[in-house]
Design a protein with these regions (language model features):
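Membrane-helix interfacial "entry" motifs
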Residues: 60, 87-95, 120, 139, ...
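Juxtamembrane "helix-exit" motif on the non-cytosolic side of transmembrane helices
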Residues: 15-17, 137, 207, 324-334
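Membrane-interface coil-to-helix junctions
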Residues: 7-109, 129-151, 244-249, 257-286
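Cytoplasmic membrane-interface regions of multi-pass membrane proteins
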Residues: 168, 203-212, 299-306
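Periplasmic/ER-lumenal interhelical loops and adjacent helix-loop junctions
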Residues: 29, 37-42, 47, 70, ...
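Hydrophobic/aromatic-rich transmembrane helices and adjacent perimembrane loops
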Residues: 336-351
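Membrane-embedded helix bundles of polyisoprenyl
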Residues: 2-3, 102-116, 120-206, 218-241, ...
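Alpha-helical transmembrane segments
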Residues: 96-103, 126, 148-151, 187-191, ...
Length: 351
């Protein structure tokens, strides 16, 4: 009910400004066009036409269907819902899928909290709200709906990692890996690095308890889960990765990363912790309003010493360093060019 009320307020703001989700950035030219193609293809399946075109120039986004359009949501299970919308409600379909992904991000955040042993319902609810309505969702998710896939699957992947650390089956993690890769390989690459950082921090907190042998076994289990997940979604993952590696934009966009950003960038980054700024600042949009900032301040000023607090501090410092140096943005972007489209990871930690 709370999310519905907040979503309604958001829609009323757009209506008051005579704005539309589809008119933002690449809405009509890219995301809406691909979403229409996905909807029409799915409807053809329902009417008995099971032929999936491998090449289609009509969308105007590139050459092959799977390799190019996976970035825009071909393979994303959420897009299956497009078949339920009539031809005269396509704008509503576009808005619904954005808000639905935001809602699912809150659910997956709550599930992660449950898996990690965070039982206080008030804390989980507040964290979910901060995560769902963080700057990345309100700016990135509105302009580019596919950006929400990174937010949606990160908590699931971290929950799967927790299950492995708790000596449970790797099946949940493997399925999450497959779904995340099939939904968007680009953000799954970033989530893989974020999960690697998470695993290292968690293992560092238990290195005396676990010992070298157990740590190596856990790393092998994680690797096995990732490989299994890739195999499950290989029919979509492999063509997508191949297309990305042979993309002319990647070949021409490689640039040398500077050692540091400008002073203006750091000023905006600090403000971005508690404000939703109108500019993306190189997609450094990690803000979780005053609630997330208050949580970080309490974490570093608290006299309570615990393993969990220590791990949170280490994780925050690591992500902050990556936000502060251009190399961090370049690494997270496949070493092509500098951008912090992974900044929802910081929003997750602050929430």
């Amino acid at each position: 009910a709370g999310f519905l009320a907040a979503a309604l307020i958001l829609l009323l703001i757009f209506a008051k400004e005579h704005a539309s989700f589809t008119k933002m950035a690449d809405g009509v030219a890219q995301h809406y066009a691909v979403l229409m193609w996905i909807r029409n293809t799915l409807r053809q399946f329902l009417h008995g036409n099971f032929a999936l075109p491998m090449v289609d120039f009509s969308v105007g986004q590139g050459f092959d269907v799977i390799g190019t359009l996976n970035y825009y949501g071909v393979g994303d299970p959420v897009n299956l819902l497009t078949v339920f919308f009539a031809d005269n409600h396509l704008d509503q379909m576009y808005m619904f899928l954005i808000l639905f992904r935001m809602y699912l991000s809150g659910l997956t955040f709550s599930y992660y909290c449950s898996t990690a042993g965070i039982q206080r319902k008030a804390s989980v609810l507040c964290g979910s709200w901060l995560y769902v309505f963080c700057s990345f969702a309100l700016i990135g998710g509105m302009k580019h709906p596919l950006f929400l896939n990174g937010m949606l699957y990160l908590p699931l992947l971290l929950a799967g990692t927790e299950k492995v650390l708790q000596k449970k089956s790797i099946r949940f993690l493997s399925v999450s890996v497959a779904l995340a890769f099939m939904s968007n390989y680009y953000f799954m690459y970033m989530n893989t690095i974020l999960c690697g950082i998470y695993l290292c921090v968690r293992l560092f907190g238990h290195y005396r308890e676990y010992g070298i042998r157990k740590i190596l076994l856990l790393i092998l289990k994680m690797a096995a889960a990732w490989i299994w997940g890739i195999c499950l979604g290989a029919v979509i993952i492999l063509p997508s990765v191949y297309a990305f590696l042979h993309n002319a934009r990647v070949d021409t966009a490689v640039e040398e990363a500077q050692n540091f950003y400008s002073i203006a960038h750091y000023r905006k980054m600090i403000l971005g912790f508690f404000q939703t700024l109108p500019m993306t600042n190189g997609w450094t949009v990690h803000g979780t309003a005053i609630g997330g900032l208050a949580g970080v301040l309490m974490l570093f000023t608290s006299k309570k010493r615990s393993r969990e607090n220590c791990q949170l501090k280490i994780g925050f410092v690591v992500l902050l360093v990556l936000l502060c140096i251009p190399f961090g943005g370049k690494m997270m972007n496949g070493f092509a060019y500098v951008t912090n489209r992974w900044s929802y990871g910081m929003a997750f930690l602050c929430a």
